[in-house]
Amino acid sequence: EIGVRLVGSEMCIRDRFVRLFDKARHCKTHCLNNIIFYQIRQLLFIKNISFGGIVVNQKKFKVGIIGATGMVGQRFALLLENHPWFEVKVLAASARSAGKKYGDVVEGRWHMTKDLPEKYKDMVIVDAENVEEVASQVDFCFCAVNMKKDEIKALEERYAKAECPIVSNNSAHRFTPDVPMVIPEINADHIKIIDEQRKRLGTKRGFIAVKSNCSLQSYVPAIHPLKELGVNKVLACTYQAISGAGKTFKTWPEMIDNVIPYIGGEEEKSEQEPLKIWGHIENGEIVKTDDIAITAQCIRVPVSDGHTAAVFMSFKDGVKKPSVEEIIKIWESYKGRAQELELPSAPKQFLHYFTEPDRPQIKSERNLENGMAVSVGRLREDTQYDYKFVCMSHNTLRGAAGGAVLLAELLCAEGYICLLYTSDAADDK
């Protein structure tokens, strides 16, 4: 009742507040702190209410970054520097980096345009193989390691079985049937499969959730709002930045003034991963959809950051296809679960349409909404397909670390990642 008075009479906020308390009543005890604190605090912030820590515990989630010295790991470190919910407590990497200060290890190989934050320079790197040591210090971990796929798969399961949730940027578990592969604006409901995964792993807190490949993060969001209107055939040609290979022009000078028409395994991921994203949960696993066919061609181009896709799509026979104007309106008005929850990293507008004939462009659009928006343009009718258009997204933000942070926010907001009741948290119970 106090909460309802605080948030006032705006029905959308008032109704959400009531639903959260109802959900909390039916939640396991260890999730109550998370749900009541983070989701309800968010509503109070919307109303600009100062509550100073007396009413609500303001403790942040303790986070680890596994693979912290690589390009994606560095991006995680930057994104989490001042995150309102997450605080980095552990930086983990390979044994050869373990025991050294993070600043010393990344000196000369810091790939970000922004300088290394002071707060990380003196943090001592932990060996990622020391699972218990890492897991005991954090509420969950992000994982972005450079290892063989079977080694990554085993390492992530070890963390999950140590009751440490893993939000992974890696591809190793993307097709594990009970591991959700999530774009929060598209298939947030797939996180429900975590309950089944925990049964298989024998865990109470631990699980693995993954983000999808960076190549499809531009065109799948644009296709998704139209899928229910009957889109059943897609051709996508992607033009992918060198940072997707973990490279810069300094480390890969061969890419200057060059195009490479091959990226190993990328076309298979681009064709198959959307089918799982658009799939459904059945008998304890995610079953891929069979109502859409995708073919893709992926090309490496001399761009630092930002993946572009040229997309062709057709609708089912007998279906009245929407007009260009209707499609643009659908794109511009689309909101997903991330926008409904107003997650910290979520773009206010997911899909931005540009009417200029020479947009979207990498330089002007890749950092739109902190690099988390998807830009679309040049929608027109096609001679072989029904429509064609161009889209782009930032591959290391929306397509990698930023997408994983957004997924973690979703998992926290929905109660799947909870604060551990360590000794310093017990007083706030």
Regions found by a protein language model. Give the residues of each.
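Basic polycationic patches enriched in arginine
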Residues: 5, 14-19, 25, 41
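Solvent-exposed polar/charged
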Residues: 4-5, 82, 228, 276
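Short terminal hydrophobic/aromatic SLiMs and anchors at protein ends
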Residues: 20, 27, 31-39, 48-49
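N-terminal Rossmann-like NAD(P) cofactor-binding subdomain of oxidoreductases
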Residues: 45, 51-261, 293, 368, ...
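Short stretches within intrinsically disordered, low-complexity N-terminal or propeptide regions
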Residues: 26, 31, 66, 427-428
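Single conserved hydrophobic/aromatic residue that forms the stacking wall/gate
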Residues: 1-15, 421-429
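Charged docking surfaces used in two-component/phosphorelay signaling
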Residues: 243-423
